[in-house]
Amino acid sequence: AIPMAYKEDIRVMLNHYIATIEAEIGDVEKDFFMHLETTDMPELFIPAEKAKVLIQALYACPHGMTAMSKTMPGLVETSTNLASVKMKEDEKGAFVEINTSQRSSIESKKHDIKQMVECALALACDEVTHGDGYPGWAPNPQSPLLEVTKKAYQDLFAAEPKVLAIHAGLECGLFLEK
């Protein structure tokens, strides 16, 4: 919430900010819009000082691709996603829940980026917890399963298959652990 005394200053600042964002992403995000309106005080809110620290922590939190594969050109190796920020309430009161996910073809790199995220969010959050996610899985170009699959493709289509690796949450790492 912004005090009414600052409403016009905020409107001018926000309109300038919107114009900047539109100039940066307008060709890609054609439906982007931001809107400022006067409303009643919400039931759930974050005190101003806590909100400032939360915004700083979110700004410091890594998001996106953090490393490319050194063995497979063009393949993202490690990434992190700042997925959602939600206001919630329980018996203790209002709190903010932040969900992130990390992926990597190298398990140790996944844990490293998870620690970076935790360090950034710990600046503002009373508690930071992690789910397990998918284990790291490095593509294996010499995999026996890949050879069987390539041969089956060649037999069916009389053509060499195009084999690529992708960066995604894959069950392959789960299968590999078994």
Regions inferred by a protein language model and the residue ranges of each:
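An extended, acidic, His-containing surface patch that forms the Zn2+-binding/catalytic region
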Residues: I2-M13, F33-N81, K86-E89, E107-D112, ...
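Short amphipathic alpha-helices in soluble, non-transmembrane regions
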Residues: Y6-E22, D112-L121
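Extended beta-strand/beta-hairpin segments
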Residues: A19, G26, E49-K50
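A structural signal for alpha-helix termini and helix-coil/disorder junctions
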Residues: T20-A23, A60, L123, D155
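Extended acidic/polar, glycine-enriched regions
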Residues: I25-E29, T39
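Short, solvent-exposed loop/turn segments that connect beta-strands within catalytic domains
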Residues: D90-A94
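C-terminal, non-catalytic macromolecule-binding modules
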Residues: V96-C125
